[in-house]
Protein backbone atom coordinates (compact mmCIF):
# COMPACT_ATOMS: atom_id res chain seq x y z
CA UNK A 1 0.00 0.00 0.00
CA UNK A 2 1.40 3.44 -0.95
CA UNK A 3 0.48 4.95 2.43
CA UNK A 4 2.57 2.45 4.39
CA UNK A 5 5.75 4.12 5.57
CA UNK A 6 4.83 7.38 3.82
CA UNK A 7 5.50 10.15 6.33
CA UNK A 8 5.96 13.80 5.38
CA UNK A 9 5.20 16.26 8.21
CA UNK A 10 5.47 19.17 5.76
CA UNK A 11 2.61 17.79 3.62
CA UNK A 12 -0.14 20.41 3.79
CA UNK A 13 -2.96 19.18 1.55
CA UNK A 14 -4.28 15.77 0.53
CA UNK A 15 -6.60 15.46 -2.50
CA UNK A 16 -8.88 12.42 -2.25
CA UNK A 17 -10.71 10.82 -5.19
CA UNK A 18 -11.31 7.37 -3.69
CA UNK A 19 -13.94 5.92 -1.39
CA UNK A 20 -11.58 5.53 1.55
CA UNK A 21 -12.83 3.77 4.66
CA UNK A 22 -11.79 2.38 8.04
CA UNK A 23 -8.04 2.17 8.72
CA UNK A 24 -7.11 3.32 5.17
CA UNK A 25 -9.05 6.55 5.66
CA UNK A 26 -7.50 7.21 9.09
CA UNK A 27 -4.03 6.44 7.77
CA UNK A 28 -4.43 8.72 4.76
CA UNK A 29 -5.86 11.64 6.73
CA UNK A 30 -3.20 11.36 9.43
CA UNK A 31 -0.46 11.95 6.85
CA UNK A 32 -1.43 15.57 6.33
CA UNK A 33 -2.58 16.22 9.89
CA UNK A 34 0.86 15.78 11.40
CA UNK A 35 1.89 19.04 13.11
CA UNK A 36 5.18 20.56 12.00
CA UNK A 37 6.54 22.99 14.61
CA UNK A 38 5.03 26.46 14.49
CA UNK A 39 4.72 26.47 10.73
CA UNK A 40 1.96 23.89 10.45
CA UNK A 41 -0.79 23.42 12.99
CA UNK A 42 -3.14 21.44 10.77
CA UNK A 43 -3.56 19.97 7.29
CA UNK A 44 -6.30 20.15 4.68
CA UNK A 45 -8.28 17.32 3.10
CA UNK A 46 -10.08 18.00 -0.18
CA UNK A 47 -12.38 15.11 -1.05
CA UNK A 48 -14.13 14.73 -4.40
CA UNK A 49 -16.24 11.93 -2.93
CA UNK A 50 -18.87 12.13 -0.21
CA UNK A 51 -17.07 10.15 2.48
CA UNK A 52 -18.47 11.90 5.57
CA UNK A 53 -20.30 8.72 6.65
CA UNK A 54 -17.12 6.66 6.16
CA UNK A 55 -15.19 9.24 8.18
CA UNK A 56 -17.64 9.14 11.10
CA UNK A 57 -17.64 5.33 11.04
CA UNK A 58 -13.83 5.18 11.03
CA UNK A 59 -13.66 7.49 14.03
CA UNK A 60 -16.11 5.31 15.96
CA UNK A 61 -13.98 2.26 15.22
CA UNK A 62 -10.59 3.68 16.20
CA UNK A 63 -11.31 6.29 18.90
CA UNK A 64 -12.70 5.84 22.39
CA UNK A 65 -15.88 7.74 23.28
CA UNK A 66 -14.10 10.57 25.09
CA UNK A 67 -11.50 10.93 22.35
CA UNK A 68 -14.19 10.87 19.67
CA UNK A 69 -15.77 14.04 21.03
CA UNK A 70 -12.39 15.83 21.10
CA UNK A 71 -11.57 14.75 17.55
CA UNK A 72 -14.89 15.92 16.15
CA UNK A 73 -14.66 19.29 17.87
CA UNK A 74 -10.98 19.96 17.10
CA UNK A 75 -10.12 18.00 13.96
CA UNK A 76 -13.09 18.68 11.72
CA UNK A 77 -13.48 22.26 10.53
CA UNK A 78 -16.61 24.04 11.66
CA UNK A 79 -19.14 25.64 9.35
CA UNK A 80 -17.97 28.93 7.85
CA UNK A 81 -20.85 30.90 9.42
CA UNK A 82 -19.76 29.83 12.91
CA UNK A 83 -16.10 30.67 12.30
CA UNK A 84 -16.97 34.00 10.67
CA UNK A 85 -19.12 35.01 13.66
CA UNK A 86 -16.09 34.49 15.90
CA UNK A 87 -14.01 36.57 13.48
CA UNK A 88 -16.57 39.39 13.73
CA UNK A 89 -16.45 39.24 17.54
CA UNK A 90 -12.67 39.53 17.43
CA UNK A 91 -12.72 42.55 15.10
CA UNK A 92 -15.27 44.30 17.31
CA UNK A 93 -13.13 43.71 20.39
CA UNK A 94 -9.95 44.97 18.67
CA UNK A 95 -11.55 48.04 17.12
CA UNK A 96 -13.32 48.98 20.33
CA UNK A 97 -10.06 48.96 22.28
CA UNK A 98 -7.75 50.18 19.50
CA UNK A 99 -9.87 52.19 17.03
CA UNK A 100 -6.89 53.81 15.29
CA UNK A 101 -4.14 51.35 14.24
CA UNK A 102 -1.83 54.26 13.35
CA UNK A 103 -1.72 55.32 17.02
CA UNK A 104 -0.86 51.93 18.51
CA UNK A 105 2.92 52.40 18.35
CA UNK A 106 2.56 55.65 20.32
CA UNK A 107 1.00 53.88 23.33
CA UNK A 108 2.84 53.17 26.57
CA UNK A 109 4.92 50.00 26.59
CA UNK A 110 2.52 47.86 28.63
CA UNK A 111 -0.44 49.03 26.52
CA UNK A 112 1.45 47.96 23.40
CA UNK A 113 2.12 44.60 25.00
CA UNK A 114 -1.58 44.21 25.76
CA UNK A 115 -2.39 44.91 22.12
CA UNK A 116 0.27 42.43 21.00
CA UNK A 117 -1.22 39.68 23.19
CA UNK A 118 -4.76 40.39 22.00
CA UNK A 119 -3.90 40.60 18.31
CA UNK A 120 -1.62 37.56 18.50
CA UNK A 121 -4.49 35.45 19.83
CA UNK A 122 -6.76 36.83 17.11
CA UNK A 123 -4.29 35.79 14.38
CA UNK A 124 -4.84 32.11 15.13
CA UNK A 125 -8.55 32.48 14.36
CA UNK A 126 -7.82 34.79 11.44
CA UNK A 127 -5.65 32.16 9.82
CA UNK A 128 -8.51 29.69 10.22
CA UNK A 129 -11.24 31.90 8.76
CA UNK A 130 -9.13 32.93 5.78
CA UNK A 131 -8.66 29.28 4.83
CA UNK A 132 -12.35 29.13 3.81
CA UNK A 133 -13.07 30.01 0.18
CA UNK A 134 -16.15 31.98 1.31
CA UNK A 135 -13.98 34.46 3.21
CA UNK A 136 -13.61 37.87 1.55
CA UNK A 137 -10.39 39.61 2.57
CA UNK A 138 -12.05 42.94 1.83
CA UNK A 139 -14.99 42.25 4.14
CA UNK A 140 -16.51 45.32 5.85
CA UNK A 141 -15.47 44.20 9.34
CA UNK A 142 -11.70 44.19 8.79
CA UNK A 143 -10.70 44.88 5.16
CA UNK A 144 -7.17 43.95 4.08
CA UNK A 145 -5.77 47.50 4.16
CA UNK A 146 -6.93 47.98 7.74
CA UNK A 147 -5.76 44.51 8.75
CA UNK A 148 -2.30 45.27 7.34
CA UNK A 149 -2.04 48.38 9.52
CA UNK A 150 -2.85 46.40 12.65
CA UNK A 151 -0.51 43.61 11.59
CA UNK A 152 2.31 46.09 10.90
CA UNK A 153 1.98 47.50 14.43
CA UNK A 154 1.84 43.98 15.86
CA UNK A 155 4.97 42.94 13.93
CA UNK A 156 6.95 45.93 15.18
CA UNK A 157 5.87 45.41 18.81
CA UNK A 158 6.78 41.72 18.58
CA UNK A 159 10.23 42.69 17.36
CA UNK A 160 10.61 45.11 20.29
CA UNK A 161 9.59 42.35 22.71
CA UNK A 162 12.08 39.91 21.15
CA UNK A 163 14.91 42.43 21.46
CA UNK A 164 14.05 43.29 25.06
CA UNK A 165 13.87 39.63 26.07
CA UNK A 166 17.15 38.90 24.29
CA UNK A 167 18.86 41.80 26.08
CA UNK A 168 17.56 40.63 29.46
CA UNK A 169 18.74 37.11 28.78
CA UNK A 170 22.16 38.30 27.66
CA UNK A 171 22.63 40.47 30.73
CA UNK A 172 20.96 37.89 33.00
CA UNK A 173 19.01 40.69 34.62
CA UNK A 174 15.70 40.06 36.36
CA UNK A 175 13.55 43.17 36.20
CA UNK A 176 12.34 44.34 39.64
CA UNK A 177 8.74 45.42 40.02
CA UNK A 178 8.78 48.41 42.37
CA UNK A 179 5.00 48.29 42.81
CA UNK A 180 5.23 44.70 44.14
CA UNK A 181 2.68 43.67 41.52
CA UNK A 182 3.37 40.78 39.20
CA UNK A 183 3.43 42.16 35.68
CA UNK A 184 2.27 39.82 32.95
CA UNK A 185 5.05 38.93 30.56
CA UNK A 186 4.21 39.71 26.91
CA UNK A 187 3.90 36.72 24.60
CA UNK A 188 6.03 36.11 21.54
CA UNK A 189 3.91 34.76 18.70
CA UNK A 190 5.28 32.78 15.76
CA UNK A 191 5.70 34.85 12.58
CA UNK A 192 4.10 31.96 10.74
CA UNK A 193 0.74 33.19 11.97
CA UNK A 194 1.22 35.80 9.30
CA UNK A 195 1.78 33.20 6.59
CA UNK A 196 -0.09 34.31 3.50
CA UNK A 197 -0.93 37.72 4.98
CA UNK A 198 2.45 39.34 4.68
CA UNK A 199 3.15 41.66 1.80
CA UNK A 200 5.70 40.32 -0.67
CA UNK A 201 8.08 42.25 -2.90
CA UNK A 202 5.87 41.91 -5.97
CA UNK A 203 3.03 43.64 -4.13
CA UNK A 204 5.39 46.41 -3.03
CA UNK A 205 6.63 46.77 -6.61
CA UNK A 206 3.00 47.17 -7.66
CA UNK A 207 2.63 50.02 -5.15
CA UNK A 208 5.85 51.63 -6.38
CA UNK A 209 4.39 51.67 -9.88
CA UNK A 210 1.34 53.47 -8.50
CA UNK A 211 3.62 55.94 -6.74
CA UNK A 212 5.14 57.26 -9.95
CA UNK A 213 1.74 57.58 -11.58
CA UNK A 214 0.50 59.99 -8.91
CA UNK A 215 -0.42 63.46 -10.16
CA UNK A 216 -0.18 65.30 -6.85
CA UNK A 217 1.67 65.17 -3.55
CA UNK A 218 -1.42 64.12 -1.57
CA UNK A 219 -1.94 60.98 -3.66
CA UNK A 220 1.79 60.28 -3.56
CA UNK A 221 1.79 60.44 0.24
CA UNK A 222 -1.12 58.00 0.42
CA UNK A 223 0.79 55.47 -1.69
CA UNK A 224 3.95 56.01 0.39
CA UNK A 225 1.91 55.24 3.52
CA UNK A 226 0.64 52.04 1.86
CA UNK A 227 4.20 51.04 0.98
CA UNK A 228 5.32 51.70 4.57
CA UNK A 229 2.47 49.58 5.95
CA UNK A 230 3.13 46.78 3.46
CA UNK A 231 6.84 46.68 4.34
CA UNK A 232 6.06 46.37 8.03
CA UNK A 233 3.75 43.38 7.58
CA UNK A 234 6.72 41.24 6.55
CA UNK A 235 9.66 41.03 9.01
CA UNK A 236 12.01 39.77 6.28
CA UNK A 237 11.33 42.90 4.24
CA UNK A 238 11.03 45.27 7.19
CA UNK A 239 14.69 44.88 8.16
CA UNK A 240 15.53 46.27 4.71
CA UNK A 241 13.13 49.22 4.86
CA UNK A 242 16.02 51.67 4.50
CA UNK A 243 17.21 49.92 1.31
CA UNK A 244 13.74 50.06 -0.26
CA UNK A 245 13.38 53.74 0.62
CA UNK A 246 16.74 54.48 -1.01
CA UNK A 247 15.75 52.38 -4.02
CA UNK A 248 12.50 54.33 -4.50
CA UNK A 249 14.38 57.62 -4.29
CA UNK A 250 17.11 56.35 -6.61
CA UNK A 251 14.55 55.31 -9.25
CA UNK A 252 13.24 58.85 -9.47
CA UNK A 253 16.76 60.20 -9.94
CA UNK A 254 18.07 57.53 -12.31
CA UNK A 255 15.26 57.45 -14.90
CA UNK A 256 13.33 60.04 -16.80
CA UNK A 257 9.55 59.57 -16.75
CA UNK A 258 9.48 58.06 -20.27
CA UNK A 259 12.08 55.44 -19.33
CA UNK A 260 10.30 54.73 -16.06
CA UNK A 261 7.19 53.76 -17.98
CA UNK A 262 9.24 51.05 -19.71
CA UNK A 263 10.44 49.78 -16.31
CA UNK A 264 6.86 49.71 -14.97
CA UNK A 265 5.60 47.30 -17.63
CA UNK A 266 6.38 44.27 -15.47
CA UNK A 267 7.29 43.72 -11.82
CA UNK A 268 10.09 41.52 -13.18
CA UNK A 269 11.88 44.57 -14.55
CA UNK A 270 11.49 46.31 -11.21
CA UNK A 271 13.03 43.31 -9.48
CA UNK A 272 15.99 43.48 -11.88
CA UNK A 273 16.39 47.17 -11.05
CA UNK A 274 16.37 46.32 -7.34
CA UNK A 275 18.96 43.56 -7.91
CA UNK A 276 21.25 46.02 -9.71
CA UNK A 277 20.76 48.56 -6.93
CA UNK A 278 21.49 45.98 -4.21
CA UNK A 279 24.55 44.73 -6.12
CA UNK A 280 26.12 48.18 -5.88
CA UNK A 281 25.19 48.45 -2.20
CA UNK A 282 26.48 44.92 -1.59
CA UNK A 283 29.90 45.72 -3.01
CA UNK A 284 30.33 48.85 -0.91
CA UNK A 285 29.02 47.14 2.24
CA UNK A 286 31.37 44.18 1.76
CA UNK A 287 34.35 46.53 1.50
CA UNK A 288 33.12 48.34 4.62
CA UNK A 289 33.04 45.05 6.59
CA UNK A 290 36.58 44.22 5.47
CA UNK A 291 37.79 47.73 6.29
CA UNK A 292 36.12 47.74 9.73
CA UNK A 293 37.97 44.56 10.70
CA UNK A 294 41.21 45.89 9.17
CA UNK A 295 41.00 48.90 11.48
CA UNK A 296 40.87 46.42 14.38
CA UNK A 297 44.00 44.70 13.04
CA UNK A 298 42.25 41.75 11.37
CA UNK A 299 42.98 41.24 7.64
CA UNK A 300 40.13 39.52 5.76
CA UNK A 301 40.64 38.01 2.29
CA UNK A 302 38.09 39.45 -0.14
CA UNK A 303 38.17 36.66 -2.73
CA UNK A 304 37.48 34.06 -0.02
CA UNK A 305 34.51 36.15 1.16
CA UNK A 306 33.22 36.31 -2.44
CA UNK A 307 33.53 32.54 -2.80
CA UNK A 308 31.61 31.88 0.43
CA UNK A 309 28.88 34.40 -0.47
CA UNK A 310 28.44 32.78 -3.90
CA UNK A 311 28.12 29.36 -2.25
CA UNK A 312 25.53 30.81 0.13
CA UNK A 313 23.60 32.26 -2.80
CA UNK A 314 23.30 28.80 -4.39
CA UNK A 315 22.23 27.25 -1.07
CA UNK A 316 19.86 30.08 -0.19
CA UNK A 317 21.47 30.66 3.20
CA UNK A 318 24.77 31.81 4.71
CA UNK A 319 25.91 29.10 7.13
CA UNK A 320 29.69 28.56 6.90
CA UNK A 321 31.43 26.23 9.31
CA UNK A 322 33.78 27.52 12.00
CA UNK A 323 36.83 26.53 9.93
CA UNK A 324 35.37 28.23 6.83
CA UNK A 325 35.12 31.51 8.74
CA UNK A 326 38.69 31.12 9.98
CA UNK A 327 39.80 30.82 6.33
CA UNK A 328 38.66 34.42 5.79
CA UNK A 329 41.49 35.64 8.04
CA UNK A 330 44.97 36.20 6.57
CA UNK A 331 46.92 35.65 9.76
CA UNK A 332 50.29 36.78 8.41
CA UNK A 333 48.90 40.19 7.40
CA UNK A 334 46.80 40.68 10.53
CA UNK A 335 48.38 42.82 13.24
CA UNK A 336 46.09 42.27 16.22
CA UNK A 337 44.87 38.68 16.39
CA UNK A 338 44.05 37.19 19.81
CA UNK A 339 45.44 33.80 20.76
CA UNK A 340 43.17 30.76 21.06
CA UNK A 341 43.31 30.89 24.88
CA UNK A 342 43.16 34.66 25.42
CA UNK A 343 40.09 35.88 27.33
CA UNK A 344 38.37 39.24 27.79
CA UNK A 345 37.29 40.85 31.08
CA UNK A 346 34.13 38.73 31.20
CA UNK A 347 36.06 35.50 30.78
CA UNK A 348 35.01 34.93 27.17
CA UNK A 349 37.52 33.64 24.62
CA UNK A 350 38.50 36.52 22.32
CA UNK A 351 39.16 34.23 19.34
CA UNK A 352 35.68 32.73 19.58
CA UNK A 353 34.12 36.20 19.72
CA UNK A 354 36.15 37.33 16.70
CA UNK A 355 35.01 34.38 14.57
CA UNK A 356 31.39 34.90 15.68
CA UNK A 357 31.55 38.63 14.85
CA UNK A 358 32.95 37.94 11.36
CA UNK A 359 30.33 35.29 10.66
CA UNK A 360 27.47 37.52 11.89
CA UNK A 361 28.70 40.47 9.81
CA UNK A 362 28.68 38.46 6.57
CA UNK A 363 25.43 36.69 7.44
CA UNK A 364 23.71 40.05 7.92
CA UNK A 365 25.31 41.24 4.67
CA UNK A 366 23.95 38.19 2.82
CA UNK A 367 20.42 38.57 4.22
CA UNK A 368 20.23 42.29 3.39
CA UNK A 369 21.79 42.51 -0.03
CA UNK A 370 21.63 39.04 -1.63
CA UNK A 371 18.81 36.93 -0.22
CA UNK A 372 16.51 39.94 0.19
CA UNK A 373 15.94 40.46 -3.54
CA UNK A 374 14.83 36.82 -3.91
CA UNK A 375 11.95 37.19 -1.41
CA UNK A 376 8.64 36.49 -3.10
Swiss-Prot record:
<dbReference type="InterPro" id="IPR027417">
    <property type="entry name" value="P-loop_NTPase"/>
</dbReference>
<dbReference type="Pfam" id="PF12008">
    <property type="entry name" value="EcoR124_C"/>
</dbReference>
<protein>
    <recommendedName>
        <fullName>Putative type I restriction enzyme MpnIIP endonuclease subunit N-terminal part</fullName>
    </recommendedName>
</protein>
<dbReference type="Pfam" id="PF22679">
    <property type="entry name" value="T1R_D3-like"/>
</dbReference>
<dbReference type="InterPro" id="IPR051268">
    <property type="entry name" value="Type-I_R_enzyme_R_subunit"/>
</dbReference>
<dbReference type="InterPro" id="IPR022625">
    <property type="entry name" value="TypeI_RM_Rsu_C"/>
</dbReference>
<dbReference type="GO" id="GO:0009035">
    <property type="term" value="F:type I site-specific deoxyribonuclease activity"/>
</dbReference>
<dbReference type="InterPro" id="IPR055180">
    <property type="entry name" value="HsdR_RecA-like_helicase_dom_2"/>
</dbReference>
<keyword id="KW-0680">Restriction system</keyword>
<comment type="function">
    <text>The N-terminal section of a putative type I restriction enzyme that if reconstituted might recognize 5'-GAN(7)TAY-3' and cleave a random distance away. Subunit R is required for both nuclease and ATPase activities, but not for modification.</text>
</comment>
<dbReference type="GO" id="GO:0009307">
    <property type="term" value="P:DNA restriction-modification system"/>
</dbReference>
Amino acid sequence: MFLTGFDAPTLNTLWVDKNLSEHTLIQAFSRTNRCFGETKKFGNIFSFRDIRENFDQALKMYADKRGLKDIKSNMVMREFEEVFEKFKDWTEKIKQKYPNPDEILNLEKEEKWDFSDLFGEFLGDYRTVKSYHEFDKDNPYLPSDEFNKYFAAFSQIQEEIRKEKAEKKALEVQEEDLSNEVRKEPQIFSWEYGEGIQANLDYIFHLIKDLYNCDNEQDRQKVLDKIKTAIRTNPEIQVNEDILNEFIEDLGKSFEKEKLEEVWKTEGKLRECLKDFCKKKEESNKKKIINDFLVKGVFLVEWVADKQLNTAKKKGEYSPSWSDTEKLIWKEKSTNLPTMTEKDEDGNFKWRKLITDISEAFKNHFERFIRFVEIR
